[in-house]
Structures are given as C-alpha cells and as structure tokens.
C-alpha cells in the first residue's frame, strides 16, 4: 500500500489543516428535535453503559459525549411515541458501538460478530447457537448478541413484517460490507473509488437506519413502493450525503490513526488530489446530492391518498436525516472534540498529529 495519504510527521509536505465545505448553509431543510429527545438519549446511554461491563473508562467517556441519542432526536423527530424513539435510539447507540468494536478486527473476527448479532435478529425469543462447520457458536451468548436481542425484541412487538424483513436484510448487508472492509485491512489495501462507494453504502449502517424511519412512524410501506426507482434514488441519495459528509467530518480523527476507509484518502491516493482539493471535491458531491434529492422529491408518483401520506412522512424522515446529521456532526465530540461548535462557524480544522487518537 502506498502510504502517501499519511506522510511522516516531520515531512515538509504534510498538510497541517483544511477548510470544511459549508454544507450546513447549503442544506435548507428545517431542523427539528423530538420533545422526548434528551430523556430518551440519556436512557440509551445508561442502557449501553450498564450492559457492557468490559468497556474501558475511556470508552465510557466517549459514549457519554457521543450523543447518539441526540442524533436520534434530530433524525426521528416524527417518532410517534417515546417507546419507538427509545428503540431507535438504542439501535443507533448500538450501531456506533459495533463500529467501535469492529474497527481493527480481522476478517474471521467480523464473521463471528456477524453470526452472533444476526442470530439475535433471526431467533429473537431464545438464543440458538449454530453448530455448522466453521460457524460453531459458544453456549453462552456474546454481549453484542444480547444487546441486539434486547432492543430487537422490543421493536418487533409492534413492527410491520415488511419492516422486520427489510431490517434483517440490510443488517446482513452491513455485516457483509464490514467483512469486506476487514479483508482490505488485513491485506493492507486501499480500494478504488467505485469499489469504496459500493462498500461504504453498507458499512455506514444507513440502510437499516432508513428502515427504522418506518418503524418510528408506525408504518410499513408496501414492497412495490419501497422498490420504486424514485424511492430507491431518495434512499441512496440520503445514504451518500450522510456517508460522504461523514468522511469529511471524520477524516481528521481517522488520519491520525491511519484509517484508510475514507473517500478523502482514496482521492489523494489514486486521483492526484491534495487534502484540500479532495475535501472540496467531496463537499461538491454532497451539495449536488442534496440538490438531486430535492429534484427527486418532486418526481415521486402517486399511489393514492393513504400510501402518499406514508411516503411523504417517510421522505420527511430522510430529509430529517440529511439536515440532522449535518448539525449533529458538530455537536458530538466524536469528530471535533470540544471544538465542534466553533469549527461549525469558521470551518477551519487543524490536523491532529499521527496516532493521537489511540
């Protein structure tokens, strides 16, 4: 692997800063927050904290300043009950937890993680360890499975069968992509841009998160509506915006620990970009994606009053994810530490030294 995106600390050509694109100003969608958001956010933090005895003190501090529950309150502000909001908040908190524990895993370890979690989704009533060759599971369920079983059992108590099927399908895609990412990490390779985009659309966890928009609203869209090309374009556009903007916001922390699963790195590695020109390029892609999303909203067909109402609320949920994630990225300490609100104003990011995040 060419190490050019992570030049030696003493190299005179290593950049020291970059300027963020002003995506917040480009996005004109209204920002809303669920009235039960703060209460539910605290409950989700307490849930994961108390359910994970192996977390280090550093990991517990990071959980407290992550504010995944606040992200939920922005992005699922239409949730019809505190109980539904809580399930989604627990899932997003859990999803960040999965991201943290899968970072650095070898391919075989991600296989084990996937089997444990998917077991909970498919056999929710009771832990049923698999015994197939190469897929043997321990008699005692691992903690990621217990957590998944806990929030999923609450979800399916009042969840449409279509939503359940789509959630399990998209979580399967998530783990397949995490496995591919682990394989690239094992082989110390950086993928080409097209391959990266395909994998990143699944490692982001956006697809199951979009399914939970339906759950939060208490709806179950018909398959022919979900599969319509315009609906698919709206889903993918939202995924791309959230994912690509996250590559910009998370780049500083990731470069400090040598993480290459980022579009900025690929543009620098294979397409001759400087750090700033790569950031600008991805920022322009994000702006175009917001514009295309607005155009696709106007192209939605009609399926009759009842379905049209469900579709309108669902698309509003995608829109809430776009604007909510942009604002939340400066509120959480995951990307910019305690400087997020200041960086949101001046958009100037000073690069962390290498290995600082470890």
From Swiss-Prot:
Gene3D superfamilies: Farnesyl Diphosphate Synthase
Motif DDXXD motif mapped to chain: 99-103
The name this protein goes by in its record: Sesquiterpene synthase Agr3
Source organism per UniProt: Cyclocybe aegerita
Any one GO BP annotation for this protein: isoprenoid biosynthetic process
Functional summary from the UniProt entry: Terpene cyclase that catalyzes the cyclization of farnesyl diphosphate (FPP) to various sesquiterpenes, including alpha-muurolene, gamma-muurolene, germacrene, delta-cadinene, delta-cadinol and cubenol.
Record site: Plays a critical role in the stabilization of intermediate cation: 96
Highest taxon of the lineage: Eukaryota
Residues annotated to bind Mg(2+) 1: 99
InterPro entries cross-referenced by the UniProt entry: Isoprenoid_synthase_dom_sf, Terpene_cyclase-like_2
Main enzyme class: lyase
The record's note on its domains: The DDXXD motif is important for the catalytic activity, presumably through binding to Mg(2+).
Chain residues that bind Mg(2+) 3: 246, 250, 254
PANTHER family for the chain: BETA-PINACENE SYNTHASE-RELATED, TERPENE SYNTHASE
Taxonomic lineage: Eukaryota, Fungi, Dikarya, Basidiomycota, Agaricomycotina
EC number in record: 4.2.3.-, 4.2.3.125, 4.2.3.126
Keywords (A to Z) from UniProt: Lyase, Magnesium, Metal-binding
Residues that hold Mg(2+) 2 according to the record: 99
